[in-house]
Amino acid sequence: MGVPKKRTSKMRRDRRRAANNNLRSAVQVTKCPNCKEPVMPHRACTSCGQYKGREVVAQAEA
């Protein structure tokens, strides 16, 4: 089994871990075409319950 000959410094360790931070992207938000509320892509709207022009979540009438 391979064993490291030298201890990994904090700087080298942190630099290696920081390399993956730029791969994460910010959360995408679009507008619902029906009610214009912000909604995440490929998900039903939480305010009107529609997805791709169809009502997929029944909303309670107030």
From Swiss-Prot:
One Pfam family hit: Ribosomal_L32p
Keywords: Ribonucleoprotein, Ribosomal protein
Keyword Ribonucleoprotein carried by entry: yes
Record region (Disordered): 1-22
Molecular function in Gene Ontology: structural constituent of ribosome
Keyword Repeat: no
Single Gene Ontology BP annotation: translation
GO cellular component: a single term: large ribosomal subunit
Ranges of Basic residues composition bias in the record: 1-18
SUPFAM superfamilies, alphabetized: Zn-binding ribosomal proteins
Family listed: Belongs to the bacterial ribosomal protein bL32 family.
NCBIfam families on file: rpmF_bact
Protein name: Large ribosomal subunit protein bL32
Organism: Myxococcus xanthus (strain DK1622)
